[in-house]
Amino acid sequence: MRFSNNFKKAPYLLQALLNVCLFFLAIALSGLLISETWYIVQFVYKSLFNKVDSYYEMLGELLIFFMYFEFIALIIKYFKSDFHFPLRYFIYIGITAVIRLIIIDHDQAISTFWWAMAILAMICAFFIVNRRNSVVEH
């Protein structure tokens, strides 16, 4: 009987551990976001004096910035929505990641095509999730 009572506490302890880990992850991601912001500011400053070879690097870093931002927003949403990750945020992050991949590595047309199909699939999934949520709300 005593083991049973301790076992019932396990989900609460694991939830607390998860919350603490996500909090520290958000702090680490915030540091990385600040680092990316500094890199972008330096890049813009260098571009004013034409010391930049390629703007693709800047675009890639900008998309990494948005990915950090989206992960932080996901963690904030997790805490605000009673410890639940909304699926649409994962879809946003997936679309951003694939767009970054296409921008950085677009040498082979067939690969770009398949990555674009992956984005289309995620957009369809996003539409289905939003439609399901709007039907459930009404």
UniProtKB/Swiss-Prot annotation:
The chain crosses the membrane at residues 14-34, 56-76, 84-104, 109-129. It is found in: Cell membrane. It holds the Pfam family PsiE. One of its GO terms (biological process) is cellular response to phosphate starvation. InterPro entries: P_starv_induced_PsiE, P_starv_induced_PsiE-like. GO terms for cellular component: plasma membrane. Keywords: Cell membrane, Membrane, Transmembrane, Transmembrane helix. It is a multi-pass membrane protein. NCBIfam families: PRK02833.1-3. Belongs to the PsiE family. This is Protein PsiE homolog. It comes from Bacillus velezensis (strain DSM 23117 / BGSC 10A6 / LMG 26770 / FZB42) (Bacillus amyloliquefaciens subsp. plantarum).
